[in-house]
């Protein structure tokens, strides 16, 4: 990841381990929050957050919380030509940390909804492909 919403490319090496949150630092997508489930190369245009094992917050909870706050994070952008988010501004985002048990309950609920959304997106994509195929067959 080097900022942005999708990877800017792929590389057989990495400098950031899996289970990391990245936040796009610059450009039109600055403030975009993403969970990285595999090792990746973190470029200079994203911030990465890795939770220490002794922390009282879990990575999945922090990801869902920051994703919920994403509009507020995006509002931190400054500059007009190539907007960016300054680390000092990002560090001011207030994070509410419930107990670890409450975090786990929230993660279970939110993960269920996330899986439902992903399944609906796949279903919609497949329907669109079928539609395109059927339309192309009508006008041969």
What are these regions (language model features)?
Residues 92-140:
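Amphipathic alpha-helical coiled-coil/heptad-repeat segments
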Residues 1-97:
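DNA target-recognition domains and sequence-specific DNA-contacting regions of bacterial/archaeal
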